[in-house]
């Protein structure tokens, strides 16, 4: 996976994601206007589905073997615990960055997840803590970080974090996603597995 190719892929990825999201939103709006009840959770699944679809197409076109090039190796209990501790320690920093950024931007994530909180707990976990990490870590720490890593660890962590932040398309989420992306990159590097950032 060459750096220049993955740079170009990010542009295609964002354009494709926005374009397909608009198409899906239009279809959902048409269905609702036609009297068809469309659950709100559908849009969350569609959003992650679009990301996964683009990632799969890219891997097929570039002939990327996910088993060989995406580090999904098993991690030990110590790495699991350390990953959970690292994630927990990130919470204060994320909250601080989010609150500071809200002085000049809007927290769209908080507004968008309000409806999800009305769903059963199991569904909340699946929609917020299972599907997004699995899909987004594949593309950002798997494809992007994996590509940039060949040019050096520091640059790879910064670039994967930057792209992770930019992908969220709003200042509030972009700022703390940038920090999260960098930390997750180092976690993957330390454990040699994408599972450390997923959990």
Residue ranges and their predicted role:
Residues 1-68:
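N-terminal, membrane-interfacial amphipathic/helix-forming hydrophobic leader that caps
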Residues 22-26, 173-199:
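Functionally important transmembrane alpha-helices
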Residues 26, 56, 161-166, 182-186:
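Alpha-helical transmembrane segments of multipass membrane proteins
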Residues 32, 38-39, 67-138, 146:
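Juxtamembrane helix-loop-helix connectors linking adjacent transmembrane helices
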Residues 34-50, 123-124, 152-156, 160, ...:
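Membrane-interface starts of transmembrane alpha-helices
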């Amino acid at each position: 996976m060459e750096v220049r190719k993955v740079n170009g892929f990010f542009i295609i990825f964002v354009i494709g994601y926005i374009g397909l999201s608009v198409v899906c939103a239009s279809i959902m709006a048409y269905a609702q206007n036609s009297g068809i009840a469309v659950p709100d959770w559908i849009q969350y699944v569609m959003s992650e589905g679009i990301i996964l679809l683009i990632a799969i197409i890219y891997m097929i076109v570039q002939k990327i073997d996910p088993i060989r090039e995406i580090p999904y190796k098993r991690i030990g209990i110590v790495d699991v615990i350390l990953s959970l501790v690292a994630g927990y320690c990130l919470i204060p920093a994320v909250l601080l960055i989010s609150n500071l950024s809200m002085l000049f931007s809007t927290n769209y994530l908080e507004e968008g997840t309000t409806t999800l909180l009305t769903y059963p707990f199991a569904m909340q976990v699946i929609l917020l803590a299972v599907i997004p990490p699995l899909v987004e870590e594949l593309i950002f720490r798997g494809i992007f970080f994996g590509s940039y890593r060949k040019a050096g660890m520091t640059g790879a962590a910064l670039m994967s974090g930057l792209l992770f932040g930019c992908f969220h398309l709003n200042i509030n989420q972009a700022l703390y996603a940038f920090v999260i992306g960098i930390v997750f990159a180092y976690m993957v590097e330390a454990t040699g597995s994408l599972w450390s950032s997923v959990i």
